[in-house]
């Protein structure tokens, strides 16, 4: 599936190594390969955006290696493709040898997978399912500041799905563990791939059922009910968390205005 980059090859370039992304001038490179010293490297086309190919190049650059979070303000599709590239690069880097027999592996030519040349085992990129949920109580929404968000951003609750657990069970468990409350009338909204590091966010809306807020201090700095027209600093547009909050605000406006 991959090939040697030629001088006139062009498009968007996802140059990644160890979950980092090359961002010269803070931007995702776009243009001809020769402009970015990529001629002769191996590249894998991982998608297309606005009629232009999006290429993955597995390479470490000496400068300007950053986080895919830095391009979160891109068009949502291009951001997802950049995230795909970072995840695939890490998958290929970390699966050079078979976990069963220890022999060298090689990439499949027909799908995103690594194949063992000895025992024929097949490996696919790991995807970690997560839940994220907006909880409404009358004219208010539950928002929390996570320990990893020291910039004042408040968002909805989220967490990883555990082995042997349904998405609905994961919502109930995560909400109880992080905030101490129970929810009801759970409704699926949408999903979003989230490359931090390899998550698939499944988004829900729910209604408050019972209980008082008691936060898990290992996860949250605080959690409170916020009236829909008096909200703190929110996640950026384009994130599924922001969509859940905006959808909840729209429901409150329709009912209370």
Swiss-Prot record:
Cofactor, free-text remark: Divalent metal cations. Mg(2+) or Mn(2+).
Residues noted as binding a divalent metal cation 3 in the record, renumbered to the chain: 174, 178, 219
SUPFAM superfamilies per record: Nudix
Catalytic activity line of the entry: a 5'-end NAD(+)-phospho-ribonucleoside in mRNA + H2O = a 5'-end phospho-adenosine-phospho-ribonucleoside in mRNA + beta-nicotinamide D-ribonucleotide + 2 H(+); NAD(+) + H2O = beta-nicotinamide D-ribonucleotide + AMP + 2 H(+); NADH + H2O = reduced beta-nicotinamide D-ribonucleotide + AMP + 2 H(+)
MF annotations from Gene Ontology: magnesium ion binding; manganese ion binding; NAD+ diphosphatase activity; NADH pyrophosphatase activity; RNA NAD-cap (NMN-forming) hydrolase activity; zinc ion binding
Cofactor(s) this protein cannot do without: Mg(2+); Mn(2+); Zn(2+)
PROSITE patterns per record: NUDIX, NUDIX_BOX
Binding, Zn(2+): 98, 101, 116, 119
Binding sites annotated in the UniProt record for a divalent metal cation 1: 158, 178, 219
Nudix hydrolase domain residues: 125-248
Binding site for substrate: 25, 69, 111, 124, 192-199, 241
Enzyme class: hydrolase
GO terms classed as biological process: NAD catabolic process; NADH metabolic process; NADP catabolic process
EC assignment: 3.6.1.-, 3.6.1.22
Binding of a divalent metal cation 2, residues: 174
This protein's record includes keyword Disulfide bond: no
Intervals of motif Nudix box: 159-180
Assigned keywords, A-Z: Hydrolase, Magnesium, Manganese, Metal-binding, NAD, Zinc
Record-linked Pfam families: NUDIX (PF00293), Zn_ribbon_NUD (PF09297)
A cellular-component GO term for this protein: cytosol
Subunit structure comment from the entry: Homodimer.
Homology family: Belongs to the Nudix hydrolase family. NudC subfamily.
Its biological purpose: mRNA decapping enzyme that specifically removes the nicotinamide adenine dinucleotide (NAD) cap from a subset of mRNAs by hydrolyzing the diphosphate linkage to produce nicotinamide mononucleotide (NMN) and 5' monophosphate mRNA. The NAD-cap is present at the 5'-end of some mRNAs and stabilizes RNA against 5'-processing. Has preference for mRNAs with a 5'-end purine. Catalyzes the hydrolysis of a broad range of dinucleotide pyrophosphates.
Protein name: NAD-capped RNA hydrolase NudC
Source organism per UniProt: Shigella boydii serotype 18 (strain CDC 3083-94 / BS512)
Gene: nudC
